Amino acid sequence: MHRYRTHTCGALTEAQVGDTVRVSGWCHRIRDHGGVLFVDLRDHYGLTQVVFDPDSAAFAAAEKVRAEWVIRVDGRVRLRPEGTENSELATGKVEIYATDLEVLGPAAELPLPVFGDQDYPEDIRLRYRFLDLRRERIHGNIMKRGQIIDSLRQRMKGQGFFEFQTPILTASSPEGARDFLVPSRIHPGKFYALPQAPQQYKQLIMMSGFDRYFQIAPCFRDEDPRADRLPGEFYQLDLEMSFVTQDDVFAAVEPVIRGVFEEFGGGKPVTQNWPRIPYAEALRKYGSDKPDLRNPLVMQNVSEHFRGSNFKVFARLLEDPKNEVWAIPGPTGGSRAFCDRMNSWAQGEGQPGLGYIMWREGGEGAGPLANNIGPERTAAIREQLGLKDGDAAFFVAGNPEKFYKFAGLARTKVGEELKLIDTERFELAWIVDFPFYEWSDEEKKIDFSHNPFSMPQGGLEALNGQDPLTIKAFQYDIACNGYEIASGGIRNHRPEAMVKAFELAGYDEATVIERFGGMYRAFQYGAPPHGGMAAGIDRIVMLLCGVSNLREISLFPMNQQALDLLMGAPNEATPKQMKELHIRPALPAK
């Protein structure tokens, strides 16, 4: 007999009745029923009920065990008494009558229980993550994560992609976030950087003559953590293709992502034909470049109905051609209580309020705005928005560049409050035609809005003859249920176009050569047209596990302060280590 087990705790069925078996695992739950001890023994594979009778030689040892002790049990498999079966367990028709018990690993008093699904403070869960990971829900999330990654890998290979590994120690480059720097012992005063993404390497792979690359890539960015972004590191499905257009990338990626959502989405409907929504349209209709299309509400520009009206606040705003008034429809939201609640919510978001019109039975508009603009304009707004009696509309006014994010939040809030969002589905879409450049108020100059290596629509001709802020890029995202889950672009593979693109953003050719020397050099020796993207594995897993916090699908995450409470990172380096690296701390004054 094997030293620890002949079967796992999820393997025993009626077929083993009468067999002598050995199992090992954790004491999940211990119950005393009239002097007979019942232990639910748990391992990675499942649960098995073990019975310790007072007549058994193992009973005395069993009386000493506590929750989460690791034990080995020998015994005979028998059917559970009629009426005590558990249909929710694979082993629910049988139990083990124990004849021998060995304690393999006793456990101290638990800081959080493994049995059950109670909420515990996050700092406790992260400090004792090894206990937290034993809990059924999060254990299942981690297993599902592995299965999703395996499925992505197989689907990519099925599409003709080959898996490569790119370096982890690389050069620092400006890619939109702070780098994690690694001091070089061999080259005093110089630093490696952990890659924010394998962007340059994957393009170099295409220039090296390979055709379709992918990897499950670790990425590192020193940025502030959020619930949908882990501090420090994350993983992405990174891919690149040679001799492709934007449509070719879409055709390769769409079945991979759609297939994974269909496989692991629990039967929820998944968008089959993904819409392609231009960036500007997404902001205009949904107030977001990652719209949640489960929400049916579409915002509309209703400026004409307020221009020259008696509602002077909006009428004066509209004298500036940059300003607009947008309407958010609110089907079934035409009650004073709901409209006032939305107005209070807007004030809580730092806004002066949220204007509204509600239509009561009989079709007459009500509310301060309706009273000011009159029945004719009110009826025209209702007709444009397709509203009916009992509905409402909410209004946001000003410069859309400044208010679109709030308008998007208001659209989401209305959809949630009126229960218009179908949470039992996955709505996926391509967001396309991103602006190539944006104006940086902080630096008072034009800068790249997304990825500096993307191809501008119109190529070198657009860079030479067009207002930079009107240039669009061959750049695209995948949005799913209000999250950006992937981003990519067709690359700028002509060296003169690359230099010009950086020049417009304030970087001269010498800077380009200094920062991107390897890629610039490769461009001189025949670079193929190429493009690709990267999908955020953590966010995809988060959506498929039905959670809203990435720490629920990550093995050993840091907390919101970028601290690893289990391992004690970051920690101080020893004087010897600092000396070897030729560095000394210059700490801020306390």
Swiss-Prot record:
Transmembrane segments: none annotated. Its main location: cytoplasm. InterPro entries: Aa-tRNA-synt_II, aa-tRNA-synth_II, aa-tRNA-synth_II/BPL/LPL, Asp-tRNA-ligase_1, Asp-tRNA-ligase_1_N, Asp/Asn-tRNA-synth_IIb, AspRS_core, GAD-like_sf. L-aspartate binds at residues 175, 221, 450, 491. It is an enzyme of class 6 (ligase). Gene3D superfamilies: Bira Bifunctional Protein, Domain 2 (3.30.930.10), GAD-like domain (3.30.1360.30), Nucleic acid-binding proteins (2.40.50.140). GO terms for biological process: aspartyl-tRNA aminoacylation. The keyword Transmembrane does not apply. It comes from the Bacteria. One of its GO terms (cellular component) is cytoplasm. It catalyses: tRNA(Asx) + L-aspartate + ATP = L-aspartyl-tRNA(Asx) + AMP + diphosphate. It holds the Pfam family tRNA_anti-codon. Keywords: Aminoacyl-tRNA synthetase, ATP-binding, Cytoplasm, Ligase, Nucleotide-binding, Protein biosynthesis. It is found in: Cytoplasm. Residues 199-202 are annotated as: Aspartate. GO terms for molecular function: aspartate-tRNA ligase activity; aspartate-tRNA(Asn) ligase activity; ATP binding; nucleic acid binding. ATP binds at residues 221-223, 484, 536-539. The keyword Isomerase does not apply. Its EC number is 6.1.1.23. Belongs to the class-II aminoacyl-tRNA synthetase family. Type 1 subfamily. Homodimer. PANTHER family: ASPARTATE--TRNA LIGASE, MITOCHONDRIAL, ASPARTYL/LYSYL-TRNA SYNTHETASE. NCBIfam families: aspS_bact, PRK00476.1. Aspartyl-tRNA synthetase with relaxed tRNA specificity since it is able to aspartylate not only its cognate tRNA(Asp) but also tRNA(Asn). Reaction proceeds in two steps: L-aspartate is first activated by ATP to form Asp-AMP and then transferred to the acceptor end of tRNA(Asp/Asn). This is Aspartate--tRNA(Asp/Asn) ligase. The lineage of its organism: Bacteria, Pseudomonadati, Pseudomonadota, Alphaproteobacteria, Hyphomicrobiales.
